A protein has these predicted regions:
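Intrinsic low-complexity, intrinsically disordered terminal tails and linker regions enriched
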Residues: 118, 141-142
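Phosphate/NTP-binding elements of NTP-utilizing enzymes
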Residues: 21-25, 108, 116-126
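Mg2+-dependent endonuclease catalytic cores in nucleic-acid-processing enzymes, primarily RNase H-like
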Residues: 1-109, 132-133, 139
Length: 142
């Protein structure tokens, strides 16, 4: 269950008016949802509730799983200082260890409907802020 209004309220409660966020995520967040209503989508609600201006960075389409898997694995293998806090992020660690792919290489969320969502967040983060890593790495290696 996700309640975007509660999430925004929790962010406001934690940070007040003293914050600068850059928001990214799933391209499907641009879709209207029956859960939201009023012809809104999640990103419009986030922008309005958090009073954001130009801090929204959402791809037109989600990255392909196979491409983001290569990017994610490359970042972890080439940046050994990239560490995920085991105490603070136990569910992300579990996703990274145990989420499986289906025959077409996509995350198999049918095996466990509670797994895979946080690895998606990590994929979207890497895709939004580090998508040029492989190109830069390959250029530096030449």
């Amino acid at each position: 269950n996700s309640d975007i209004y509660q999430l925004c309220d929790a962010i406001i409660a934690e940070y007040g008016d003293n914050y600068y966020f850059r928001v990214t995520g799933d391209a499907s967040g641009n879709n209207r949802s029956a859960m939201v209503g009023d012809n809104l989508n999640y990103y419009k609600i986030i922008i309005k509730k958090l009073k954001l201006e130009d801090q929204l960075f959402v791809p037109a389409a989600n990255p392909l799983h196979r491409n983001s898997r290569v990017l994610t694995n490359s970042l972890f293998s080439r940046h050994t200082d990239l560490i995920i806090d085991e105490e603070g992020c136990p569910f992300l660690i579990a996703d990274l260890k145990f989420v499986e792919c289906n025959e077409s290489g996509e995350i198999d969320k049918k095996k466990d409907k509670y797994k895979g969502h946080l690895i998606d967040c990590l994929r979207y983060y890497f895709n939004s802020w580090h998508s040029d890593f492989l190109r830069k790495y390959n250029e530096a290696s030449d």
